[in-house]
Amino acid sequence: MRKEKSLGLAAEMRKLAEASREAARALSHADPRRKDAALRAAAEAIGRREKRILSENARDVAAARAAGQNAAYLDRLRLDPKRLAGIGAALHEIAGLRDPVGEVTASWRRPNGLEIRKVRIPLGVVLMVYEARPNVTVDAAALCLKSGNAAILRPGSDALRSSLALAAAFAEGLEKAGLPAASAQVVPTPDREATYELLALDDLIDLAIPRGGPSLIRAVAARSRVPVLKHYQGVCHLYLDASAPPQQAVDLALNGKVQRPGVCNATECLLVHRGAAGKLLPPVGRALADAGVELRCDPTALTILKRAGVAAVPARPDDFGKEFLDKILAVRVVADLDGALDHIARYGSLHTEAIVTRDLASARRFQREVDASAVMVNASTRFNDGGELGLGAEIGISTTKLHAFGPMGLAELTTQKFLVEGEGHVR
């Protein structure tokens, strides 16, 4: 029985992917105005279908609550009229972005007269695997459509009802614009095997992008025959150099940790130069503790903070290199910039690293030697975001160096091909 079920599911997923492949062919040369019209029509459809979408979302939330999911998880899953309006606004924003397809990124003429251009083209079919965030269903579908890609959307089972309801509204927009319905498809079953069947279809799917916790990303990477671009964990460090201005150190530490502690570009570890730790740690630690942050410190940092009357606890060995996604911060005193670079090289996740310093030489060295998708000088780790960097909306922040590194906007959902024009040239 299980084998028959598996064969049936495999055939169903292949049929779904084949439909996406056909849609991708049409989207690769679709009129940009038609794509934008679909996005705007989808936004209007979400508004009209609000009652239905919220009803399905309420069922998802109730089931997740009954399954014992925590408050933060339920908050990510929950939709309300304001959040739905935000999803609609995001569709209008994406419609207003510049279409990357067909952009000429370079051109030159060879001595033999050949005219050569490099132009952006869609990737093809993108499989998005993500956890219980219904908004990702629409964001991913919209970004893929705008960049000429077909999207296969695999939400976590807890968000399946919400995602199907949102996808129905998106399909209405596609239909009104005369684009293929298979341009954006939600996998209609919660069966985990469906994901693995899709990940085996490297003849039909061009890229898989997992967004979620480490276990999800490891599972996708281990089982996939399709190239995987990982939106992995953000173990982001803030290093306070010897010359760091105290108030700036306080401001950046607070913003990085407290503004939204549950996101991937939140600061997870504070490193402080030994020569300035006595001056910097007490005000920074006090501000963080007053904001409700639990400080998990190495022995040196713990001694300094305790002496200053700041609440702190000893760090466990595994606190360094951990993505807390909560009001928890690992704190370590390092000997100098070399010590900070060594720590980041060992514990960083290639996401975002930041330094606070007045020393230009230290700043430039930090930029050169730190391996991360974004390196901040006197700016919060929270700025590693497509919108904040001026890229527009993003599908995720890649910690994989191939094919994109950092926030993935529309351009990162394309590749490039060469267009070569001659006059009967032979080699």
UniProtKB/Swiss-Prot annotation:
An annotated GO cellular component: cytoplasm
Catalytic class of the enzyme: oxidoreductase
Pathway(s) where this gene product acts: Amino-acid biosynthesis; L-proline biosynthesis; L-glutamate 5-semialdehyde from L-glutamate: step 2/2
CDD domains named in the record: ALDH_F18-19_ProA-GPR
Coiled coil start-end: none
Reaction catalysis annotation: L-glutamate 5-semialdehyde + phosphate + NADP(+) = L-glutamyl 5-phosphate + NADPH + H(+)
Similarity comment: Belongs to the gamma-glutamyl phosphate reductase family.
Name of the molecule in the record: Gamma-glutamyl phosphate reductase
Species, as recorded: Anaeromyxobacter dehalogenans (strain 2CP-1 / ATCC BAA-258)
Lineage of source species: Bacteria, Pseudomonadati, Myxococcota, Myxococcia, Myxococcales
